[in-house]
């Protein structure tokens, strides 16, 4: 195969970035915007020895699972929705198969065991308009007009769009007010290459249970000229609760700055997951799909199977979202998180919910737990620290082996693993199964419909119980 070759390909799988995967005479091709079941004509744009990348030129025979009219006309250009052109039922089947395949292949979990413990994926009734948070870059088009939207896949080129199919409806109104304000008052948009211009991004957060709205303008400066004019328009939107600016003068592609200045209202909004209330600031980590998060955490609580006498460790606890869920049913919960701001939020969230049996530690889970285990042994005459249940919700890279070993050494009866990457989940499950734990329940949860991402909740139990 060579660059510019035109080939006909039957698509058999989806890659980690959402690309369709097919083979021509044993040669693997990755083709963006093609889905499983399509037969496509594609032009090779990059040819390696054993695989290549091709551009979709024509759909010869569409898959029976192809959506005739995608909900968002920008889907192919924008980097946000990789598989929006696939019917939702097929998306769920693909994600469930991906989790199962990784557990079989990487985790070496026997098929018979998976048949027994794996539950069907938990999907959404309405797989659009589910995101409670959106970050919109601000820039200019070729004519110099101020625009906002989303970055095209793997670029920092803005695709103009104020009406994202995954975001809430009020986003469009807010963005239009901000764009008009900037044009009318000659407020400049940030230019990433030149590091000039004022407004970099707009962050919008929405409380699904409270209808509270936050708007935060990320700025390459300390002050927004004519801010009162913008505030006057925005605060008339029903539910508007917080209008702030985030100062970010660094030459970086990190979106938020660390300094938040209040323009109007308060610096946070509130929302609920189940009956637990959370205060969410512009810098808070908070799950973006509250409908599915409630199901996800409900499963984690179910798998922990608490009776009120347990000591629970929640590793990578963020702002305490899972910890505070668990604290309602446990004797004591300890949460660990590396981000100090998140721990401040976690402690505050415990306080506003009158939860007194949750303590939080700042630090790397990989360091805090082994250190606690070691110090406990030293101060208790060699007696080992014990936890009844350990919950982990790590980033995509999964858990470090040293942390997994400490978990095993602490001999919890149950381990609940919440994963956003089924490949690293499978690797870690393999370690735990080889160290005396067995799979009891697995449920994938579609936290991000129309994308390739999938969350999974796994319950493991010590074999000698």
PLM regions and their residue ranges:
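Terminal RNA-binding accessory module
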Residues: 1-74, 359, 367
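Carbohydrate-binding surface patches
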Residues: 203-207, 212-223
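Short, acidic/hydrophobic/Gly-rich beta-strand patch recurrent on exposed beta strands
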Residues: 20-25, 149-152, 216-218, 346
């Amino acid at each position: 195969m060579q660059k510019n070759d035109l080939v006909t390909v039957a698509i058999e799988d989806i890659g980690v970035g959402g690309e369709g995967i097919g083979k021509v005479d044993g040669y693997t091709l990755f083709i963006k915007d093609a889905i499983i079941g399509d037969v496509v004509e594609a032009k090779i744009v990059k040819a390696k020895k054993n695989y290549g990348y091709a551009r979709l030129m024509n759909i010869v025979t569409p898959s029976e699972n192809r959506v005739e009219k995608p909900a968002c006309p920008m889907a192919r250009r924008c980097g946000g929705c990789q598989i929006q052109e696939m019917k939702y039922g097929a998306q769920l089947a693909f994600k469930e198969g991906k989790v199962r395949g990784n557990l079989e292949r990487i985790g070496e979990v026997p098929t018979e065991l998976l048949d027994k413990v794996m539950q069907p994926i938990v999907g959404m009734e309405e797989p659009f308009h589910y995101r409670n948070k959106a970050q919109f870059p601000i820039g200019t088009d070729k004519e110099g007009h101020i625009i906002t939207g989303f970055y095209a896949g793997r670029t920092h080129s803005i695709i103009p769009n104020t009406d994202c199919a995954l975001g809430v409806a009020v986003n469009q109104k807010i963005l239009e007010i901000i764009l008009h304000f900037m044009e009318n008052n000659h407020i400049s948009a940030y230019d990433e290459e030149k590091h000039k211009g004022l407004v970099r991004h707009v962050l919008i957060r929405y409380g699904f249970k409270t209808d509270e709205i936050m708007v935060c303008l990320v700025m390459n400066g300390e002050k927004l000229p004519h801010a009162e004019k913008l505030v006057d328009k925005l605060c008339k939107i029903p539910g508007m609760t917080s209008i702030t600016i985030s100062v970010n003068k660094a030459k970086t592609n990190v979106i938020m700055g660390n300094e938040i200045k209040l323009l109007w209202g308060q610096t946070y909004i509130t929302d609920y997951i189940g009956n637990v209330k959370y205060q969410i600031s512009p810098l808070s980590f908070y799950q973006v799909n509250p409908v599915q998060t409630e199901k996800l955490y409900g499963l984690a609580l179910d798998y922990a199977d608490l009776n009120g006498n347990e000591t629970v460790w929640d590793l990578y606890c963020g702002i305490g979202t899972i910890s505070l869920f668990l604290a309602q049913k446990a004797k004591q919960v300890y949460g660990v998180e590396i981000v100090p701001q998140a721990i401040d939020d976690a402690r505050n969230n415990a306080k506003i919910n009158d939860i007194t049996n949750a303590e939080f530690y700042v630090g790397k889970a990989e360091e805090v737990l082994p250190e606690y285990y070691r110090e406990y042994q030293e101060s208790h005459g060699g007696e080992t620290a014990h936890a009844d249940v350990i919950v982990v919700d790590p980033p995509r890279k999964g858990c470090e082996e040293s942390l997994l070993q400490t978990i095993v050494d602490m001999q919890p009866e149950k381990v609940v693993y919440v994963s956003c990457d089924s490949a690293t989940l499978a690797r870690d499950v393999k370690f735990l199964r080889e160290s005396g734990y067995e799979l009891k329940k697995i449920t994938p949860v579609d936290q991000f419909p129309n994308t390739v991402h999938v969350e999974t909740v796994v319950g493991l139990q010590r074999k000698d119980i």
